Amino acid sequence: MALNLQDKQAIVAEVNEVAKGALSAVVADSRGVTVDKMTELRKAGREAGVYMRVVRNTLMRRVVEGTPFECLKDTFVGPTLIAFSHEHPGAAARLFKDFAKANAKFEIKAAAFEGEMIPAAQIDRLATLPTYDEAIARLMATMKEAAAGKLVRTLAALRDQKEAA
């Protein structure tokens, strides 16, 4: 179906606004994936706070101009599904990675985070980023560990001091 100029401008404006507020973006090729599977992916994306859209490549090139995702321009070849993460930078990458494991025909092309393009082979860098809550939990565990270690060293020094006396 042909789009008129106003429709194209509306699509570019809408997706550009989403891109400006996004933390990361992932580009994939969904050729050969059934409609049912794509519907499941879109539902999971909505639950994870990920905006997904299939947009013509020429329009996508205009969408990413002036955004941190401009580095993805070369990946807009063939059928392109793009996902923008708003709540957590690794959400879209994690979603696409899990979906690609279950669907062999789904191919991740690349991702972008803070203006840096991440090739599909290195998508784990983005997908394994801890969430905010996970990062806080790790920090607290490290701090708790350090305090416990300091207590043990203090008690050992006190014991050594008493043995010496």
Curated annotation (Swiss-Prot):
GO terms for molecular function: large ribosomal subunit rRNA binding; structural constituent of ribosome. Pfam families: Ribosomal_L10. Keywords: Ribonucleoprotein, Ribosomal protein, RNA-binding, rRNA-binding. Disulfide bonds: none annotated. It comes from the Bacteria. One of its GO terms (cellular component) is large ribosomal subunit. Gene3D superfamilies: 3.30.70.1730, 6.10.250.2350. GO terms for biological process: translation. Forms part of the ribosomal stalk, playing a central role in the interaction of the ribosome with GTP-bound translation factors. Part of the ribosomal stalk of the 50S ribosomal subunit. The N-terminus interacts with L11 and the large rRNA to form the base of the stalk. The C-terminus forms an elongated spine to which L12 dimers bind in a sequential fashion forming a multimeric L10(L12)X complex. Belongs to the universal ribosomal protein uL10 family. This is Large ribosomal subunit protein uL10.
